[in-house]
């Protein structure tokens, strides 16, 4: 039977009504053109079923419903008697998505944006959405000043109704700012105002912040900077009237004109506080005091609002509202500030939760909390918990989130979200210098053993001059009050002459135990006991060694000697760094010392002081200045000298970079008859034949030391934002000296420097790169000594794993 077909609808739903009001009864529904979409799925999306009586409106609704599924780019509905024939053309399926020519936008970011718009491999292609994406990407390029950019979507058909989608980018070049004009300024010059902008029409070579490339977002920030500049100086009526951005015909240049009205300067006449102050009116009034005749300052007003919110937050009012309304009196040029405060409800903490701590146990994090469950919410206590977690050094990032409990008017949960870092490290170091050659060191350290917070270290060194092993364990919470307990045992076989030090061998072993007592949030006192056995041999007589032996009642030509010492160890630590892992703000001071106690063969004391201060110079803490110092002093007691093997040394990656480790400071002056190792090429003699002694390049250290360093940390070039918190670049200037306060110049040959002079300061400068790698912290440094003395040994390139600062 010839099929009688009637076209009743199309893509634009523009067909005429042909059935009349009564319509017809559908006895069957057939589809043509389905490939990927199942018949059942298509039927479910239709409002019409077999047996329904349909009219023109029902058919139009059917077409709309099928289009709404997003699976079809064309739909036609035909009638064959009482059968509906639905002809569809499915949208093609995306088989692959590729990008070409995109440099400013990474592939991953493009994929995320496409997926957010429903464009992904395996999904059907919506050409309308594709056009919107093209326009959106071009708008993005325009916003960053690339006005010649274009984005085209190239769709290549494939068999089985599939397509390849390729986005082709022509980014062009960024339009550069030719001139920035500010019209209407009288109190301040245009140059002064523009000097605070990120966008510039001229950028000196030394300015690493300014940028001539136009970006819409940066312009918005600069306009806000301009507004704040005037409001902070009393111009309460200041207004930006308009902003024009003009493009040159070749789309490579930008002219920016900002029209402003400065107005007059206004002074504050008073501050009136009203509203629900939750019983803290006296404290709030202290925060709103102003000096008589003080200029209106927008930043101070904002800070005052924030201070009031913080004050109320400390008492559990988590969501206070503080609004300041300036009342401007144009007659006498004054502003009265009306501050309305609504403290809101007082909130209590139901639970404290931790997220992201896959290795660290909850108890390790919970013991750092100062906010208690069941107590009212204290914003300062929550922040203290965040600071303490950061200072542990276990985490790359720590964030807090205060979540309201559903159905409760006054309860919240506090969530700490942490991102753990690798707290274990291989302490492996390599150094190379023109004189020293290659040197090695190794060890293993785990600062968060099995997630318990215990610090466990197994360190060992094996090279031509030393065999060293150490096991150390520290429990930071030996008691619930935070008293720590640490201990270690060690063995050391040290051939000093092979290490470019004075000639002797020391085999030592010992142990110590230390308790740490937290005084407050930032201060800790430590006290402990130690024991060490030193067995000296192969000692070649030299002046510093002779002084020590004589003070111990030994002959100057003694070649071997043993001593057992018991010490009282003490220390104090002040730590207010923002985090233990790559700090960017705050200070740390560490004082350590020890003194021998009765029962010891030696009688002496030693004190060391280390300080580090980080000062960020931008709001994002990406540019940081670091100042470090290290001081040390020791001396004998009861007429005895401090053992020469306890001397301080300087030089190397942790003190003065660019110098070989431990080589700065006094050198050995060997006595008559002293013999050196014939394989030792560092000395210019085999046997000393001068009665006054022979100088050498062998370092002996000193009983006093001073080291300082100034470091400028910058963002690391070519590093993505993902790794910005794991890599640190710095330029440094190191200086330091070691001296012997007991040195007598008259006891040495005339060609020997005065080693009691602290003014023999060494200096170096260079660049360093630190990377928190999966193996632990890696430190690369290159330094050039520019002030050194005879006998000093340079080591320009140094590389270490396991040391950061």
Curated annotation (Swiss-Prot):
It comes from the Bacteria. The keyword Acyltransferase does not apply. Residues 1-20 form the signal peptide. Keywords: Cell outer membrane, Membrane, Repeat, Signal, Transmembrane, Transmembrane beta strand. Gene3D superfamilies: membrane protein fhac, membrane protein fhac: a member of the omp85/tpsb transporter family. InterPro entries: Bac_surfAg_D15 (IPR000184), BamA/TamA_POTRA (IPR010827), D15-like (IPR039910), OM_assembly_BamA (IPR023707), POTRA (IPR034746). GO terms for biological process: Gram-negative-bacterium-type cell outer membrane assembly; protein insertion into membrane. Residues 24-91, 92-172, 175-263, 266-344, 347-421 form the POTRA domain. The keyword Nucleus does not apply. PROSITE patterns: POTRA (PS51779). Part of the outer membrane protein assembly complex, which is involved in assembly and insertion of beta-barrel proteins into the outer membrane. Constitutes, with BamD, the core component of the assembly machinery. Belongs to the BamA family. Part of the Bam complex, which is composed of the outer membrane protein BamA, and four lipoproteins BamB, BamC, BamD and BamE. This is Outer membrane protein assembly factor BamA. The lineage of its organism: Bacteria, Pseudomonadati, Pseudomonadota, Gammaproteobacteria, Enterobacterales. The gene is bamA.
């Amino acid at each position: 039977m010839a099929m009688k077909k009637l076209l009743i609808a199309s893509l634009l739903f523009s067909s005429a009504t042909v059935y009349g009001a009564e319509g017809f009864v559908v006895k069957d529904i057939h589809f043509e053109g389905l490939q990927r979409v199942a018949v059942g799925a298509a039927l479910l999306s239709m409002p019409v079923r077999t047996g329904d009586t349909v009219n023109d409106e029902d058919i139009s609704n059917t077409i709309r419903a099928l289009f709404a599924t997003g699976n079809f780019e064309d739909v036609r509905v035909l009638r064959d008697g009482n059968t509906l024939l639905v002809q569809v053309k499915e949208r093609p399926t995306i088989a692959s998505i590729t990008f070409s020519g995109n440099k400013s936008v990474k592939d991953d970011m493009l994929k995320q944006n496409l997926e957010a718009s429903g464009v992904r491999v395996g999904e059907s292609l919506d050409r309308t959405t594709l056009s919107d994406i093209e326009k959106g990407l071009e708008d993005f390029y325009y916003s960053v000043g690339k006005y010649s950019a274009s984005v085209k979507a190239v769709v290549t058909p494939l068999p089985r109704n599939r397509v390849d989608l390729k986005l082709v980018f022509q980014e062009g070049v960024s339009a550069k700012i030719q001139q920035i004009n500010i019209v209407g300024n009288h109190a301040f010059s245009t140059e002064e105002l523009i000097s605070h902008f990120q966008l510039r029409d001229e950028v000196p070579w030394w300015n690493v912040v300014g940028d001539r490339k136009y970006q819409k977002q940066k312009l918005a920030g600069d306009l806000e900077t301009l507004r704040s500049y005037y409001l902070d100086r009393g111009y309460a009526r200041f207004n930006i009237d308009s902003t024009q951005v003009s493009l040159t015909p070749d789309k490579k240049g930008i002219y920016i004109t900002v029209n402003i009205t400065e107005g007059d300067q206004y002074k504050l006449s008073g501050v009136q506080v009203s509203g629900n102050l939750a019983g803290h009116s006296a404290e709030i009034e202290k925060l709103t005091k102003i000096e008589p005749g003080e200029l209106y300052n927008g930043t101070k007003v904002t800070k005052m609002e924030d201070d009031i919110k913080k004050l109320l937050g400390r008492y559990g009012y988590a969501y206070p509202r503080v609004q300041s309304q300036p009342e401007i009196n144009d007659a006498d040029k004054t502003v009265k500030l009306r501050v309305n405060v609504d403290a809101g409800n007082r909130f209590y903490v139901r639970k404290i939760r931790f997220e992201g701590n896959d290795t660290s146990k909850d108890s390790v994090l919970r013991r750092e909390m100062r906010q208690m469950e069941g107590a009212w919410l204290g914003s300062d206590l929550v922040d203290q918990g965040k600071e303490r977690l950061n200072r542990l050094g276990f985490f790359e990032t720590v964030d807090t989130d205060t979540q309201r409990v559903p159905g409760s008017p006054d309860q919240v949960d506090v969530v700490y979200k942490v991102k753990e870092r690798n707290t274990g490290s291989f302490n492996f170091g390599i150094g190379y210098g023109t004189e020293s050659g290659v040197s090695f060191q190794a060890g293993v350290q785990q600062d968060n053993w099995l997630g318990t917070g215990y610090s466990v270290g197994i360190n060992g060194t094996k090279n031509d001059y030393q065999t060293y092993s150490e096991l150390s364990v520290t429990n930071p919470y030996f008691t619930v009050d935070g008293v720590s307990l640490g201990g270690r045992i060690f063995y050391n076989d040290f051939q000093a002459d092979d290490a470019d030090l004075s000639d002797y061998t020391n085999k030592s072993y010992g142990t110590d135990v230390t308790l740490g007592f937290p005084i407050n949030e930032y201060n800790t006192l430590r006290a402990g006991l130690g024991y060490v056995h030193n067995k000296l041999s192969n000692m070649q007589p030299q002046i510093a060694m002779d002084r020590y032996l004589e003070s111990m009642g030994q002959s100057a030509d003694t070649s071997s000697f043993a001593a057992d010492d018991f010490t009282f160890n003490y220390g104090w630590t002040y730590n207010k760094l923002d985090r233990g892992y790559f700090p960017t703000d705050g200070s740390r001071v560490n004082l350590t010392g020890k003194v021998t106690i009765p029962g010891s063969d030696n009688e002496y004391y030693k004190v060391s002081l280390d300080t580090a201060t980080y000062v960020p110079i931008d709001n994002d803490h990406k540019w940081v200045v670091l100042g470090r110092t290290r001081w040390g002093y020791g001396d004998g007691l009861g007429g005895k000298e401090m053992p020469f093997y306890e001397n301080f040394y300087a030089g190397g990656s942790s003190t003065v970079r660019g110098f070989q480790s431990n080589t700065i400071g006094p050198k050995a002056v060997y006595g008559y008859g002293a013999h050196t190792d014939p394989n030792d090429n560092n000395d210019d003699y085999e046997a000393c034949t001068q009665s006054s002694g022979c100088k050498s390049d062998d370092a002996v250290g000193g009983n006093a030391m001073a080291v300082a360093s100034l470091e400028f940390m910058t963002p690391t070039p070519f590093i993505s934002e993902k790794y910005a918190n794991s890599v640190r670049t710095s330029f440094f200037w190191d200086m330091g000296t070691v001296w012997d306060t007991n040195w007598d110049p008259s006891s040495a040959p005339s060609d020997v420097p005065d080693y009691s002079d602290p003014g023999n300061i060494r200096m170096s400068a260079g660049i360093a790169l630190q990377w928190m790698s999966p193996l632990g912290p890696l430190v690369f440094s290159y330094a050039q000594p520019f002030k050194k003395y005879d006998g000093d040994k340079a080591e320009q390139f140094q590389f270490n794993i396991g040391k950061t600062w």
